[in-house]
Amino acid sequence: MSSQQIVFLIVNAIGGIAVLGSYAIGLGMFPEYREALWGEVRGTLRTGITISMLFAALGYLSFCYVALFQNGLSDFNKVNWFNQYTVSVLIAIFLISATFWMPTAIAYLNFSNTYWLVVCILSLWVTAISLVAILGITITADLESIGSISHYVAIIGIGLITFHCLVFDAIIWAIMFTK
């Protein structure tokens, strides 16, 4: 296993635990806010967002599979913004910012302080922008190490989570939460 793959795995393991942990702790310690965390998102829109969450998670896992097991990291990291760890750095930014959403949303609901709302929405935008960067890198990657099918799987996978985080979280949820 290459150093790129090891760093990628560590970032995803620690970051994934942090994101899921923030959700578990937030919902476990503040069950009274479960409904309020949806804001004004109701009915069909809520169902659609929930279904999109599942596709986004599967898409991200598909991207990770290509990155780790189809030599995608070697092609994706040729962008060289952060040496050979560009994708891992962007994923760290994505996961760190995603970890902030639940606690800042709960802090806003608990204290009604606009500061928490700003940090909450900013965390959603940082999450979305980092995913847009990863999507751009994935789309423009050379196909030296991976085949076209793996490349398209990675694009569709990261595209699904990017769409969800940008459209449903950073735009729609932010508008509906602050109504």
List the predicted regions and their residue ranges:
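Alpha-helical transmembrane segments and their helix-start/interface "positive-inside/aromatic belt" motifs
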Residues: M1-G15, T47, Q84-Y85, S145-G159
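Membrane-interface interhelical loops and short amphipathic "cap" helices
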Residues: M1-Q4, M29-L45, A105-V118, L143-I146, ...
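Alpha-helical transmembrane segments of multi-pass membrane proteins
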Residues: G15-P31, V167-D169
